[in-house]
Swiss-Prot record:
Family assignment from sequence similarity: Belongs to the SAICAR synthetase family.
Protein name (database record): Phosphoribosylaminoimidazole-succinocarboxamide synthase
GO biological process: 'de novo' IMP biosynthetic process; cobalamin biosynthetic process
Organism for this UniProt entry: Clostridium botulinum (strain Loch Maree / Type A3)
Entry annotated with the keyword Ligase: yes
Catalytic class of the enzyme: ligase
Molecular functions (GO terms): ATP binding; phosphoribosylaminoimidazolesuccinocarboxamide synthase activity
EC numbers for this chain: 6.3.2.6
Length: 234
């Protein structure tokens, strides 16, 4: 496999082509952003940690029957992945009220929900990734109802698998967001699963072990990511 030119650079990753048109190299950066890019910073070795965490969690999910774009971890910052067309939606899964949902609905952070909540947002930086519903997504040509049904099914399987896994590591999976990619073989879980994309709280202390520490200037951000890596790697 030969790495070629950069195809795309996002907030947290760079995507490079390879000599195989069906694969890409994903490079994990140390850049940190919050509030749709309004807050910017750097977390030392974040890319290294998130690459490792994502690689291990994607391998776990593959074993549990969730198809992903992940092929292999190449080095400490890069992984080889299947090339996909990203559906321009984020699927957000919430087990406990926190973040924007708690604020939007006037709920206390940490409130248990009577059922898991599934939301979608339109991936559009200019619009600040607005929350939309299924009908919006289909009406403006982003997806189909059939595809959405499959996306929610993937999200539910990811949630069930990771909730159980993290619980065994003494971590509460509060909420997370995923991205889905279209490939010739159907839909694949893409992007990453890490403290950048999940809210993860220590089961005993309630300590936040995710990007909220950066968002809210709580300090010890690197240490929190390292703690998640340590527990995932048990």
């Amino acid at each position: 496999m030969e790495k070629k030119d950069m195809l795309y650079e996002g907030k947290a990753k760079k995507i490079f082509g390879t000599d195989d048109k069906d694969t890409v190299v994903v490079y994990y950066k140390d850049d940190a952003t919050a509030f749709n890019g309004e807050k910017k910073g750097t977390i030392e070795d974040k890319g290294v940690m998130n690459n490792s965490i994502t690689s291990m969690l994607f391998e776990l999910l593959e074993k549990k029957g969730v198809k992903t774009h992940f092929i292999e971890k190449i080095n400490e910052r890069e992984q080889l992945c299947k090339k996909v067309e990203i559906v321009p939606l984020e699927v957000i899964v919430r087990n406990i009220a926190a973040g924007s949902m708690a604020k939007r609905l006037g709920l206390s952070e940490g409130r248990k929900l009577d059922t898991t909540v599934f939301e979608i947002s339109y991936k559009n930086d200019d619009l600040n990734d607005p929350l939309i519903n299924d009908y919006h997504a289909v009406a403006i040509g982003l997806t189909t109802f059939e595809e959405l049904k499959e996306m929610y099914s993937i999200a539910e399987k990811v949630n069930n698998t990771l909730k159980e896994f993290f619980d065994k590591q003494g971590i509460i999976l509060v909420d997370f967001k995923i991205e889905i990619g279209r490939s010739r073989g159907g839909l694949l879980l893409a992007d990453e699963i890490s403290p950048d994309t999940c809210r993860l709280w220590d089961k005993k202390t309630g300590e936040k072990l995710d990007k909220d520490r950066f968002r809210r200037d709580m300090g010890n951000v690197k240490e929190a990511y390292m703690e998640i890596l340590k527990r995932v790697n048990k």
